Amino acid sequence: MTKARIDARFAELAREGRAAFVPYVMAGDPDRETALAILKGLPAAGADIIELGFPFSDPMAEGPPIQRAAGRALAKGMTLQGVLDLVRAFRAGDATTPLILMGYMNPLVTWGLEAFARDASDAGVDGLIIVDCPPEEADPLADALDAAGVSLIRLATPTTGDARLKVVVRRTSGFVYYVSVAGVTGVKEADAAAVAPNVERVRKASGLPVAVGFGIKTPERAAQVAQVADAVVVGSALVDEVAEAVDMNEDVTARVLSKVESLAKAVRLARRSHEAV
């Protein structure tokens, strides 16, 4: 399946006239068993696509919430092999929900790009977002992923000009991830009115659906962004729920999935203001 799952999901949602809800969770946070329970519960809670972070010791694009989540996962022994094992366990019960890995280049280089692409595809990964791989250096990774049938999903930002955007989207497939605010994750809030023209610009340049992430923390904000984007990504707000549940000795899985349900409902009820892709 791989790439086909992403395309099929966006086609399905376009027919429904709504955006996808994409929760981001960190693999292995707060531990492997809980992370797997959360992962398995996401589709029923309303996730249309899942973004699974793999922990890295120097997550430069992340704000404090996701940095701490990576630290918790690493402290519990989560590895890149462990991440693929989680994906396999998830796929044993779900063959249709697209799953994207998000992380950094160094662990992939250590693994070997071609080998990792094959292993990720075999595990059931549909796409990959690598935060610190610029387009000028992306061809070896893009070639490996293409051969394995896995999408390389690239990032565009508010400061990505038109000429640069052409370079960014050249090897992109699946969708484009639009970073709605400058800076690291979990700090500022997205402004749907400001996001809208850039989302349309990215959509026209790429011919692909556009997901908007960074700065979306509440159902209200998610609904606003869902009116102009093809997908809404929420990450820091969910990893915050993990941290707070751990601190308060609450049921982590139940708390996270409850938050997902409220966000997913808001996205599902929001009607998109542009024609479906």
From Swiss-Prot:
This is Tryptophan synthase alpha chain. Pathway: Amino-acid biosynthesis; L-tryptophan biosynthesis; L-tryptophan from chorismate: step 5/5. GO terms for cellular component: cytosol. Tetramer of two alpha and two beta chains. The keyword Amino-acid biosynthesis applies. Its EC number is 4.2.1.20. The keyword Lyase applies. It comes from the Bacteria. Signal peptide: none annotated. The alpha subunit is responsible for the aldol cleavage of indoleglycerol phosphate to indole and glyceraldehyde 3-phosphate. It catalyses: (1S,2R)-1-C-(indol-3-yl)glycerol 3-phosphate + L-serine = D-glyceraldehyde 3-phosphate + L-tryptophan + H2O. It comes from Phenylobacterium zucineum (strain HLK1).
